[in-house]
Amino acid sequence: PEQLIEQARALRHLILRHPPGHAQRTLAYFMALGHYDAQIRRLRRHLGGRRQVLQAALDQHQLFSHTASHFGGTSFWMKGPDWLDSRALADRAAEMGVLIEPGEVFFQSGAAQHNYFRLAYSSIGESQIAEGIGRLAAAVETLRP
């Protein structure tokens, strides 16, 4: 781990030496005036509503097991049945207007699990979530052996 940390620090140094001073000052004012905390509260309310709608839609369709942080976040980590290939599901769902992120890229090389995927909700309106999960369920059914 120490060697990795050293390499990461060296890379960071090449990518970003110092944020511009005016950007640092603007952010400092934004935070000092309480705007950052207010924005976090707004985001928590906004995303919390979407999260609840997504949770209800997933519960209704009972397709997959899933996990999501209880402290925020913008996506659910989904585990499909063993036969499910999340890459094929991503392609089929995209044809139906639903985007998911296959999970194998999140696993260490050689340990990829093809039935996992990430389902994000930060850019989808609450009114579209239930329909999207219905479409995702239909996409799964087309792949069922």
What function would you assign to each model-found segment?
Residues 1-145:
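PLP-dependent class I/II
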